[in-house]
Regions:
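Acidic, glycine-rich segments within the central catalytic cores of soluble metabolic enzymes
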Residues: 125-236
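N-terminal helix-loop segment corresponding to the beta1-alpha1 unit
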Residues: 1-174
Length: 236
């Protein structure tokens, strides 16, 4: 999604896939033609090539691409790109202006750095998962909060800021984004509750969490649901 936003804004995005299975998203869900609908949606406006980065020839192609690029985005676990000879220092040596963005689950170091994860893990560790649902139990949101906030919007913001600086200073940067950290940084009301009261807000309570009748969801007679958002008296 991060590179999709860049592509939609006009960037020439070249997506690199491995030479065997390629991007597994090609087979995710119903297909339309040779690839899944999901794959086509998130890879619109992109070009694609297949490279085996474990082979010298594949690495050489990547280095040539990086030499003429402004941005590189990678989503491997920490250290993988460096082992392939394509870490930030390797590519900065051939293109000092390169903005190199790494998107990981839990950051480049720390006790969880090498762990894999999915959206549900990231929002759980960040405390957001505990805030979604009713007093009885949390729910699994059918909207990937961490993947989109931490894996797309936060990286794009960092990339664009670094790109502006690189164009004026001539020096690129390593933009390091941990999806769990990005979610936690945006959990403002959760943090406010903890700092003010020493505990996080109860699930299904509070002004924006379902504790008020003027900001809630109600089942209607015809079996649908109605969202009411009238916090201010003038709207009620």
């Amino acid at each position: 999604m991060a590179t999709l936003h860049l592509a939609d804004m006009g960037a020439d995005v070249v997506k690199i896939e491995d030479t065997e299975a390629g991007d597994y998203a090609r087979a995710m869900g119903p297909a339309r033609g040779r690839s899944s609908v999901f794959f086509q949606l998130v890879n619109r406006n992109k070009r694609a090539i297949r490279l085996d980065l474990k082979q010298p020839q594949g690495r050489e192609v990547l280095l040539r691409l990086a030499k003429g690029a402004e941005i590189l985005v990678e989503g491997f676990r920490p250290g993988v790109m460096a082992k392939l000879g394509a870490g930030y220092n390797d590519l900065a040596a051939v293109n000092p202006r390169l903005v190199y963005c790494s998107i990981t689950s839990y950051g480049q170091d720390g006790p969880y750095a090498d762990r894999a994860g999915h959206d549900i893990n990231y929002i759980g560790y960040a405390g957001v998962g505990d805030q979604i649902g009713t007093e009885e139990a949390p729910v699994v949101p059918n909207f990937q909060i961490a993947d989109l906030l931490g894996g797309a919007l936060t990286p794009v913001m960092g990339i664009l800021a670094a790109l502006i600086d690189a164009r004026s200073s001539g020096r690129g940067r390593h933009v390091d984004v941990a999806m769990t950290d990005a979610v936690f940084a945006h959990a403002i009301l959760l943090l406010v509750g903890f700092l003010e009261h020493g505990k996080t807000p109860g699930r299904g309570t509070g002004m924006l969490g379902g504790g008020l009748p003027c900001y809630n969801v109600y089942r209607t007679r015809d079996g649908r649901y109605m969202a009411v958002g009238a916090l201010e008296r003038k709207f009620w």
